[in-house]
């Protein structure tokens, strides 16, 4: 059977035209940071297990943790922890019915990103200064 209304149907937005809202991007990032925290947990767990295993195992694990790759993983995990924590707090406000309007969700997304970066930088400063 022929479709007589073929030209009158609405078209989907093209992927190059459609932009995800910032709230959607931060929601996706919350899921990604939750999974990325595993990398830091694995590295710290390996370091702690090596500390009670033998001096040679600890020396190897300690070298990895203190290397530039270990620093990047631990710093990224620390940022992911702050991001995930702040996103969880924002979600509690959503559950209570606050901040659900588009403009409020956009502002809370901006605050989430800025807050996580500021807290991560402050944590690094405290870690290296004190």
Swiss-Prot record:
InterPro entries hit by this protein: SQR/QFR_C/D (IPR034804), Succ_DH_cyt_bsu_CS (IPR018495), Succ_DH_cytb556 (IPR014314), SuccDH_FuR_B_TM-su (IPR000701)
Biological function: Membrane-anchoring subunit of succinate dehydrogenase (SDH).
Presence of keyword Phosphoprotein: no
CDD domains, per the entry: SQR_TypeC_SdhC
Entry's transmembrane regions: 27-52, 69-89, 110-130
Pfam families registered for this protein in UniProt: Sdh_cyt
GO biological process: tricarboxylic acid cycle
GO molecular-function terms, A-Z: electron transfer activity; metal ion binding
Residues the record lists as binding heme: 84
Cytoplasmic compartment residues: 1-26, 90-109
This protein's name: Succinate dehydrogenase cytochrome b556 subunit
Stretches of the chain found on the membrane's Periplasmic side: 53-68
Biological classification of the source: Bacteria, Pseudomonadati, Pseudomonadota, Alphaproteobacteria, Rhodobacterales
Family: Belongs to the cytochrome b560 family.
Protein's organism: Paracoccus denitrificans
Co-factor: note: The heme is bound between the two transmembrane subunits.
